[in-house]
């Protein structure tokens, strides 16, 4: 399988970012483990996959996979890299975008300085 990807770094975490908008990517636990392996694959802390939105009020859906292939709910450093990837690759011309994750919605903003601002939903402390 051949895929286009970017290797990105955010405050010490490294990511393989995959555009699932313009190419088909069949994700499996074994594929994630291979990509993340530092000797046999590309090597990364997490694999990030950008997908089409699942709701009309969202710009993109964002999936986060740990090195062991498990899918997780959130990664703030990864969200910053996703915003930069979306902007740099022309996937959106917007400065502010909304993305959904496994269980959350984030607002991302590309600042004039090139930095990325990530706005999380307020935490819920009740069980």
Where are these regions (language model features)?
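Catalytic phosphate-donor-binding core of small-molecule kinases
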Residues: 103-127
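A glycine-rich beta-to-alpha transition motif near the start of alpha/beta enzyme domains, typified by
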Residues: 1-112
